[in-house]
């Protein structure tokens, strides 16, 4: 995924009302940009920290700028635009980068499924046998470790998705939880037990029921983002 044009850089002044952020450009100009992330953005939101944003030429947009990347306190880069994860994964699926999911004959997005009113990110068809793939974007890192964690806040919705995947797996349907790690300098992923114990327990239960868990890392900068490597998932605390 290439950013065209390249991202512009600024300094974060504040984030507020969930969807808004004020930044200062190198020229000293201040502007308000859209924040496409409804989560806590723990570790990705530091006043005075460097941020990168895309700029739209659409005259109908009230805010032309969209926050894309943050520099974390550890000096890593994190893609905070959660909408990028599914696009990155689809790009990688079609390119054959995610080797565990190579060979599908059709791809459908946002397919309704399950008993709790869920929508799966991707349904892949493999010679008549489907695979259901749920994508989560990972941006939470910690000092002195190259292990990222998910989630960065309590997520009942995330636990619901794991329950739905587990039900599919128990029925013999291929079900996959895929973590897209949009954070540089990471070698592995784990559930953030210290933030959401219920999610961590749901993940381990889903694996016991047959859900496949995959994690892939990205390479990212102001020019673009690409999924480039498989990462291990550490399930035990």
UniProtKB/Swiss-Prot annotation:
It comes from the Bacteria. One of its GO terms (molecular function) is DNA binding. It holds the Pfam family SfsA. Belongs to the SfsA family. This is Sugar fermentation stimulation protein homolog. The lineage of its organism: Bacteria, Pseudomonadati, Pseudomonadota, Gammaproteobacteria, Pseudomonadales. The gene is sfsA.
């Amino acid at each position: 995924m290439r950013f065209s044009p390249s991202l512009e850089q600024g300094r974060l002044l504040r984030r507020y009302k969930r969807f808004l952020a004020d930044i200062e450009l190198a020229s000293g100009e201040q502007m308000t940009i859209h924040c496409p992330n409804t989560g806590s953005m723990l570790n990705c939101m530091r006043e005075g920290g460097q941020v990168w944003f895309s700029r739209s030429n659409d005259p109908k947009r009230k805010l032309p700028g969209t926050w894309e990347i943050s520099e974390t306190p550890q000096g890593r880069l994190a893609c905070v635009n959660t909408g990028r994860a599914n696009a990155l994964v689809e790009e990688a699926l079609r390119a054959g980068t995610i080797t565990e999911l190579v060979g599908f004959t059709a791809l459908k997005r946002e397919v309704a499924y399950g008993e709790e009113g869920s929508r799966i990110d991707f349904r892949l068809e493999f010679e008549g046998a489907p695979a259901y793939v749920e994508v989560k974007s990972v941006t939470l890192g910690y000092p002195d470790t190259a292990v990222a964690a998910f989630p960065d806040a309590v997520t009942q919705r995330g636990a619901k998705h794991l329950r739905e995947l587990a039900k599919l797996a128990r029925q013999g349907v291929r079900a996959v939880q895929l973590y897209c790690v949009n954070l540089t300098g990471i070698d592995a992923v784990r559930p953030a037990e210290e933030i959401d114990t219920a999610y961590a327990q749901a993940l381990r239960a889903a694996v016991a029921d047959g859900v496949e868990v995959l994690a892939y890392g990205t390479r990212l900068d102001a020019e673009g983002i690409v999924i480039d490597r498989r990462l291990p998932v550490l399930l035990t605390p």
